[in-house]
Amino acid sequence: MQDECHNCATTAENAVEEIFKVMEMVMQHFRNMNPMVLFDMHKFHDKAFAKFMEHKNIFLLDVISTNLKRGVSEGYFRQDIKIDILAKFRLESMMLAFNMEAFPPVKYNAAEVTIIVIENFLYGLATASGFKLIEQYKAKKNTIHAQ
C-alpha cells in the first residue's frame, strides 16, 4: 500500500488528481474487503492491529499532510487551512466506513462511504480553481465508470 500511495503522489499532475487516484485505489481495495476486518483485527489480533495503527498514524498522516501542503502551494487548496488539524481529521474520517454502528455493512457500502467523505472533504479545501479541477476529475471519473 505504501508503494501505491507513493505512486499516486508521484504520477499525479497536482494534489487534486492525487486524491482522485487515491479514491480509485480505495475503490479497488474495498471491493474485496470485508468491513469487519478492522473490527476482527482489533478484537483478535492485537499485534497486527497495533501495526496497522502505527502505519495509519505515521505513514498515512504524512501522506495526507504532504498532499495538503502540495494543494496549498499549487493554489488548489485554500491558504488558510490548518494542515495539522485537517490531516488528522482526514485520517480519522477514513475510519468512518468501518464504524459498523454508524454505517452498518448491510445498509452501506464502505467504498461509497469513503468516496463521499473524501469528495466532501476535498470541496471544503478547494479554492475556486481547485473547485473547477475537482469538477473536471469527477466528470472524467464518472465517464470512465459509466463505460
Role assignments for model-derived ranges:
Residues 1, 22, 26, 56-60, ...:
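Hydrophobic/aromatic residues within well-ordered alpha-helical segments
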Residues 5-8, 37-41, 101-104:
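Secondary-structure edge/capping motif, primarily at the C-terminal ends of alpha-helices
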Residues 31-65, 72-76, 80-85:
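Short secondary-structure transition hinges
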Residues 66-70, 74, 104-147:
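C-terminal peripheral helix-coil segments that are non-catalytic and often amphipathic
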